[in-house]
Amino acid sequence: MEMTNAQRLILSNQYKMMTMLDPTNAERYRRLQTIIERGYGLQMRELDREFGELTEETCRTIIDIMEMYHALHVSWTNLKDTQAIDERRVTFLGFDAATEARYLGYVRFMVNIEGRYTHFDAGTHGFNAQTPMWEKYQRMLNVWHACPRQYHLSANEINQIINA
């Protein structure tokens, strides 16, 4: 992340204020303030992750994934025989915190801040699937989009989607 000295000074002052406003996270803010003030390039890359960007297309894809899981769960609930498919298979897991942190952050934002998909169970890991999921979700979306009745899926269609 490239910043002018003026930008670094402003950000440093922001971190200084945050240490006073949020004492529980003061150490974290002091550390970030030091990194910014001294211009430690390697550690400043952490800010790239914090201030990263998701394109509109990526955000829409994540919402589409969440909507697919909503449709899967609704369809599963409407099945006469729900025993044939384990409910965990139609439960949204989230994304991997280690490799898909930006996607995970967006999911948490959508649920916790925007109040969408609040019926999703965050589990004990807060939607951290602990394994990369993006490619799997892409395959699932392709199958789901090909279904004629996306919110009234049969057991066979549900199985095709979750096994994609």
From Swiss-Prot:
It holds the Pfam family YfbU. SUPFAM superfamilies: YfbU-like. It comes from the Bacteria. InterPro entries: UPF0304_YfbU, YfbU_alpha-helical_sf, YfbU_helix-hairpin_sf. HAMAP family: UPF0304. Belongs to the UPF0304 family. NCBIfam families: PRK05445.1. This is UPF0304 protein YfbU. It comes from Salmonella typhimurium (strain LT2 / SGSC1412 / ATCC 700720). The lineage of its organism: Bacteria, Pseudomonadati, Pseudomonadota, Gammaproteobacteria, Enterobacterales.
